[in-house]
Amino acid sequence: MTDLKGRIALVTGGGRGVGAAICKMLAERGASVAVNYHSSKVDAEGVVAEIEKTGGRAKAYQADIADANVVKKMIAGIKSDFGGLDILVNNAGLVFRKKFSESTPEDWKKQVDTCLYGALNCSHSAGPLLEASGRGRIISIMGDSSRVGESGLAIGAAARAGTIALMKSLAREWGRSGVTANSISLGLIETAHDKAWVEANRDKLVKAYAIRRLGLPSDVAPLVTLLASDAGAWITGQVISVNGGYSMV
């Protein structure tokens, strides 16, 4: 049911962590994968090499998703190289942990540009291809702070909450074309923060989770694969948490 043979996927921020795990699992299920990166070319090309080594098809694409014109060129390149697009995973994000009272408009802009406008730009440019597919999928990744709020993450939470509303709206608008749009909200993933900070605070952090550990990229990729496949064809407009029991709302 999670067979993705013949499908083409774009994963933003696909060179590292959760994005890399998603790329690899989609490829394992048979999808051709466009691995987007902003600055980590070596990482993205490493993911491509791993996929190709196991007989899969993948290519790295450099693009700042906050720039609408650059995104349009990337989508056009994917169409030219692969023939279309069936799956969009809005994974790339940028979040600064800082008290709201100490944050600046420059901080706000950087996070909103990547987290909200990035999803807007990619969804808008990919939309015609996803609708033409007849089985298009949009899956947006975010932190659970976008659902329940969190001190120090006000801007990132607000930007990602906007993405949740975008997914729900696109689920309604594009559903008649067979497109589904869902959000996955995450607890703290091991690879998403500075390793030294995680180790210094691990004992305190894990106490917030019903399952007493932090998340791994491998915890996220299976749900993305499900939603991208025919098995997820009747799931749309939803926010699904993969969070070890951090929040249960």
What is each of the regions a protein language model found here?
Residues 8, 15-16:
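Conserved glycine-rich cofactor-binding loop
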Residues 45, 172, 176, 183-209, ...:
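A glycine/serine/threonine-rich, flexible loop-to-helix segment
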Residues 97, 139-162, 167-176, 188-189:
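Catalytic loop of short-chain dehydrogenase/reductase
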Residues 99-112, 194, 205:
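Substrate-binding pocket helix/loop in short-chain dehydrogenase/reductase
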Residues 128, 172-173, 233:
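Alpha-helical segment proximal to the catalytic Tyr-Lys
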Residues 135, 175, 180, 235-237:
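Short, small/polar-rich loop/turn modules that mediate ligand/substrate recognition or access, typified
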